[in-house]
Protein backbone atom coordinates (compact mmCIF):
# COMPACT_ATOMS: atom_id res chain seq x y z
CA UNK A 1 0.00 0.00 0.00
CA UNK A 2 1.19 3.51 -0.79
CA UNK A 3 1.68 5.67 2.30
CA UNK A 4 2.96 8.82 0.65
CA UNK A 5 4.12 10.38 -2.60
CA UNK A 6 6.29 13.47 -2.96
CA UNK A 7 8.00 15.31 -5.78
CA UNK A 8 10.23 18.34 -6.09
CA UNK A 9 11.93 20.34 -8.81
CA UNK A 10 15.14 22.22 -7.97
CA UNK A 11 16.96 24.78 -10.08
CA UNK A 12 20.60 23.71 -10.45
CA UNK A 13 21.75 27.27 -11.13
CA UNK A 14 20.09 28.46 -7.91
CA UNK A 15 21.88 25.73 -5.96
CA UNK A 16 25.18 26.72 -7.65
CA UNK A 17 24.67 30.36 -6.62
CA UNK A 18 23.85 29.27 -3.06
CA UNK A 19 27.01 27.13 -2.94
CA UNK A 20 29.07 30.08 -4.21
CA UNK A 21 27.53 32.48 -1.71
CA UNK A 22 27.33 30.35 1.43
CA UNK A 23 29.78 27.49 0.77
CA UNK A 24 30.35 25.16 3.71
CA UNK A 25 27.67 26.86 5.78
CA UNK A 26 25.05 25.72 3.26
CA UNK A 27 26.62 22.31 2.65
CA UNK A 28 26.91 21.50 6.35
CA UNK A 29 23.37 22.63 7.15
CA UNK A 30 21.66 20.62 4.41
CA UNK A 31 23.84 17.66 3.41
CA UNK A 32 25.40 14.78 5.33
CA UNK A 33 29.13 14.11 5.14
CA UNK A 34 28.51 11.18 2.79
CA UNK A 35 26.42 13.34 0.46
CA UNK A 36 29.09 16.03 0.44
CA UNK A 37 31.87 13.58 -0.42
CA UNK A 38 29.79 12.18 -3.29
CA UNK A 39 28.89 15.62 -4.67
CA UNK A 40 32.39 17.06 -4.43
CA UNK A 41 33.80 14.14 -6.47
CA UNK A 42 31.37 14.74 -9.32
CA UNK A 43 31.93 16.84 -12.42
CA UNK A 44 28.53 18.51 -11.92
CA UNK A 45 28.81 19.38 -8.22
CA UNK A 46 25.79 21.71 -8.18
CA UNK A 47 23.66 19.22 -10.12
CA UNK A 48 24.49 16.47 -7.65
CA UNK A 49 23.56 18.69 -4.71
CA UNK A 50 20.39 19.88 -6.49
CA UNK A 51 19.18 16.30 -7.00
CA UNK A 52 19.72 15.54 -3.33
CA UNK A 53 18.00 18.79 -2.32
CA UNK A 54 15.00 17.80 -4.47
CA UNK A 55 15.01 14.28 -2.97
CA UNK A 56 14.89 15.65 0.58
CA UNK A 57 12.05 18.02 -0.31
CA UNK A 58 10.17 15.19 -2.02
CA UNK A 59 10.71 12.85 0.93
CA UNK A 60 9.45 15.42 3.42
CA UNK A 61 6.31 15.81 1.28
CA UNK A 62 5.83 12.04 1.08
CA UNK A 63 6.08 11.94 4.88
CA UNK A 64 3.17 14.38 4.92
CA UNK A 65 4.99 17.12 6.78
CA UNK A 66 7.20 19.11 4.47
CA UNK A 67 10.28 20.64 6.03
CA UNK A 68 8.33 23.10 8.16
CA UNK A 69 7.14 20.54 10.70
CA UNK A 70 10.29 19.48 12.50
CA UNK A 71 12.12 17.35 9.96
CA UNK A 72 15.70 18.52 9.62
CA UNK A 73 17.54 18.46 6.30
CA UNK A 74 20.08 15.99 7.66
CA UNK A 75 17.32 13.65 8.90
CA UNK A 76 17.21 12.54 5.25
CA UNK A 77 20.20 11.33 3.26
CA UNK A 78 20.63 9.96 -0.26
CA UNK A 79 23.27 7.36 -1.05
CA UNK A 80 23.64 5.12 -4.08
CA UNK A 81 23.90 1.38 -4.53
CA UNK A 82 26.80 0.12 -6.65
CA UNK A 83 24.33 -0.07 -9.53
CA UNK A 84 23.78 3.69 -9.18
CA UNK A 85 20.25 3.35 -7.80
CA UNK A 86 19.59 6.09 -5.24
CA UNK A 87 18.55 5.08 -1.73
CA UNK A 88 16.86 7.36 0.81
CA UNK A 89 17.82 6.96 4.48
CA UNK A 90 15.88 8.62 7.29
CA UNK A 91 16.87 9.28 10.89
CA UNK A 92 15.64 11.47 13.73
CA UNK A 93 12.19 12.99 13.40
CA UNK A 94 11.85 11.76 9.81
CA UNK A 95 12.31 8.19 11.05
CA UNK A 96 9.79 8.78 13.83
CA UNK A 97 7.24 10.16 11.34
CA UNK A 98 7.84 7.19 9.02
CA UNK A 99 7.27 4.75 11.89
CA UNK A 100 4.08 6.57 12.94
CA UNK A 101 2.57 6.37 9.46
CA UNK A 102 3.47 2.70 8.92
CA UNK A 103 0.57 0.35 9.77
CA UNK A 104 1.16 -2.45 12.29
CA UNK A 105 2.43 -5.62 10.65
CA UNK A 106 4.10 -3.69 7.83
CA UNK A 107 7.51 -2.28 7.03
CA UNK A 108 8.03 0.96 5.17
CA UNK A 109 10.10 1.07 2.00
CA UNK A 110 11.16 4.40 0.51
CA UNK A 111 11.57 4.48 -3.27
CA UNK A 112 13.40 7.46 -4.77
CA UNK A 113 14.26 8.42 -8.31
CA UNK A 114 16.39 11.37 -9.40
CA UNK A 115 16.91 13.04 -12.75
CA UNK A 116 18.25 16.26 -14.17
CA UNK A 117 18.06 18.21 -17.39
CA UNK A 118 19.94 21.46 -16.91
CA UNK A 119 18.89 23.74 -15.31
CA UNK A 120 16.45 21.43 -13.50
CA UNK A 121 16.89 18.56 -11.05
CA UNK A 122 13.87 16.50 -10.10
CA UNK A 123 13.07 13.84 -7.54
CA UNK A 124 10.11 11.57 -6.89
CA UNK A 125 9.66 9.69 -3.62
CA UNK A 126 7.10 6.96 -2.98
CA UNK A 127 6.73 5.48 0.50
CA UNK A 128 5.26 1.99 0.42
CA UNK A 129 4.13 -0.27 3.26
CA UNK A 130 4.86 -3.95 2.71
CA UNK A 131 3.50 -6.74 4.93
CA UNK A 132 6.12 -8.20 7.25
CA UNK A 133 7.19 -11.69 6.28
CA UNK A 134 6.32 -14.32 8.87
From Swiss-Prot:
Gene3D superfamilies the record matches: 4'-phosphopantetheinyl transferase domain
Principal subcellular localization: cytoplasm
MF annotations from Gene Ontology: holo-[acyl-carrier-protein] synthase activity; magnesium ion binding
Protein residues bound to Mg(2+): 8, 57
Reaction(s) this enzyme catalyzes, per UniProt: apo-[ACP] + CoA = holo-[ACP] + adenosine 3',5'-bisphosphate + H(+)
One Gene Ontology cellular component: cytoplasm
Keywords assigned by UniProt, alphabetized: Cytoplasm, Fatty acid biosynthesis, Fatty acid metabolism, Lipid biosynthesis, Lipid metabolism, Magnesium, Metal-binding, Transferase
Keyword Lipid metabolism annotated: yes
Protein localization: Cytoplasm
The EC number(s) this enzyme carries: 2.7.8.7
Reported cofactor(s): Mg(2+)
A Gene Ontology BP annotation from the UniProt entry: fatty acid biosynthetic process
Enzyme class, UniProt record, top EC level: transferase
Superkingdom assignment: Bacteria
HAMAP family: AcpS (MF_00101)
Family: Belongs to the P-Pant transferase superfamily. AcpS family.
Role of this protein: Transfers the 4'-phosphopantetheine moiety from coenzyme A to a Ser of acyl-carrier-protein.
Protein name: Holo-[acyl-carrier-protein] synthase
Lineage: Bacteria, Pseudomonadati, Pseudomonadota, Alphaproteobacteria, Rhodobacterales
Amino acid sequence: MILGIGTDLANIERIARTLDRFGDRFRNRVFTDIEQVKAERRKDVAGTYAKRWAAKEACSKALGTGLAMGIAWKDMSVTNLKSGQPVMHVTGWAQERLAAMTPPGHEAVIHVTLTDDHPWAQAFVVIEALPLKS
